[in-house]
């Protein structure tokens, strides 16, 4: 049984319960990270590109109503989800979405960026500077060099950007203004 606790209106309550019984969670290893009204938030046990898969389950029906990937790199430093009310009173969730494209911005430049802007609804956003790539002429990473080895220039690009989601009655995800970051996909 899960008991919801009160929290500030723009945050999830500070709780983490690992559920390892598929009968209780519906998915082995997912972690309950909080509740907001009738909505239960779950996080996957592992992630990529600085993000974690999360899902939202309607407590009233027990059905999953939404799933995506959010930037959750340091939960103690920053709350990954923000909550607000739309003018019509519906709850909005805000977070930094993590996606992986099917091309490399450093390698393919504006042709890749144009495809990704359309695919992810990023409008007329300027092309972001990408990190984590080996630049032409740069030496390869050699153990025991410090840091993370840079990826080849042709590695697909991962993007993080701010979105807001209206969950009910049907999920609707919209990019919102803010910084778009690009890195080499893991």
Tell me what each language-model feature is.
Residues 1-26, 147-158, 175-179:
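Terminal domain-start segments
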Residues 34-42:
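Repeat-blade elements of multi-bladed beta-propeller folds
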Residues 24-33, 69-86:
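Repeated scaffold domains used in trafficking and secretory/extracellular systems
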Residues 4-6, 55-60:
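Structural recognition of the beta-propeller blade-terminating site
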């Amino acid at each position: 049984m899960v008991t919801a606790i009160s929290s500030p209106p723009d945050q999830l309550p500070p709780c983490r319960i690992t559920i390892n019984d598929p009968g209780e969670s519906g998915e082995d290893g997912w972690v309950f990270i909080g509740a907001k009204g009738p909505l239960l938030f779950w996080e996957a046990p592992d992630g990529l590109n600085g993000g974690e898969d999360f899902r939202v389950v309607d407590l009233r029906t027990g059905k999953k109503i939404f799933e995506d990937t959010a930037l959750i790199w340091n939960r103690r430093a920053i709350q990954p989800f923000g909550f607000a009310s739309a003018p019509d009173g519906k709850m909005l969730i805000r977070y930094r979405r993590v996606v992986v494209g099917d091309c490399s911005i450093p390698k393919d430049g504006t042709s890749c960026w144009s495809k990704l802007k359309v695919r992810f609804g990023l409008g007329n956003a300027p092309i972001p500077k990408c990190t984590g790539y080996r630049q032409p002429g740069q030496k390869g990473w050699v153990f025991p060099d410090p840091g993370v080895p840079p990826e080849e220039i042709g590695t697909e690009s991962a993007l993080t950007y701010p979105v807001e989601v209206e969950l009910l009655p049907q999920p609707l995800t919209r990019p919102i203004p803010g910084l778009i970051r690009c890195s080499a996909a893991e």
